[in-house]
Amino acid sequence: SSEFKRSANKGRGDGGKPAELNKYLGLREGDLKRLRGDSLIYKNGHCYVIVDKGKGGKYQEQRVCDKDIAEVEKFFDGSHRKLFIAGDFGRNFDYHGQRREYAMNICAYYTEQAKDPKFRKELYKEIATQWHQLNKKHRGHLEPLSFFDQPYVLRGKNKDLAIKQGRPWILDRLALRATSVLHLAHWRDNVTVQSYLARR
């Protein structure tokens, strides 16, 4: 059963078409409203959705997981028209809750995939590319790959909450950074943990 609130709008109890797309992207509701038919791009062998003027007015590129590209492509027709109109959105649907669930799922996915040393190096390379191109505040301060061999350990209330909910409290730091940079457009691990991975 869904953790998300059902909408009072008839036919929009599941969040409508925006929620169908968002299960593959984990965007904020405001970002979904700005998407256009030409917001999908391909760069360095990967697929991204452009979020123009996202939170804080930032330009963002949200990575589409390789396994989800075919489904995401169905929503984009290459035109400059907006993907959704106001009536497509569920009035009481928790799109941000959907974003939290997506963050947990994508972090778990990377944790599993990053057990392969080759995948791990390629993932770090992609993080570095996006970091140096889009992180205006800390472009020159990405840690070396060896830094990410150290796990990110939840502490205090965050650890207690994770244990209570049966979720991991020792995280793969590279998987966490990939989730943060490539999928949430955050640049700090602690923000991602506090806002998405250790919250309900």
Give the predicted meaning of each segment.
Residues 16, 96, 100-104, 175, ...:
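A structural signal for well-ordered alpha-helical segments within the folded catalytic domains
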Residues 2-29, 158-167:
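Basic, Lys/Arg- and aromatic-enriched nucleic-acid-binding interface segment
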Residues 58, 63-158:
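Active-site/catalytic core of tyrosine-dependent DNA strand-transfer enzymes
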Residues 1-5, 11-13, 44-48, 75-76:
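A short mid-domain helix/strand-loop element embedded in enzyme catalytic domains
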Residues 12-15, 21-34, 105, 109-114, ...:
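A short, glycine-centered helix-capping/turn motif at helix boundaries
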Residues 47-52, 147-200:
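Short functional hotspots where side chains directly engage DNA or cofactors
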Residues 34-71:
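Conserved tyrosine-mediated DNA breakage-rejoining catalytic core shared by Y-recombinases
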Residues 6-15, 29, 70, 80-85, ...:
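Internal alpha-helical scaffold/solenoid segments in large eukaryotic proteins
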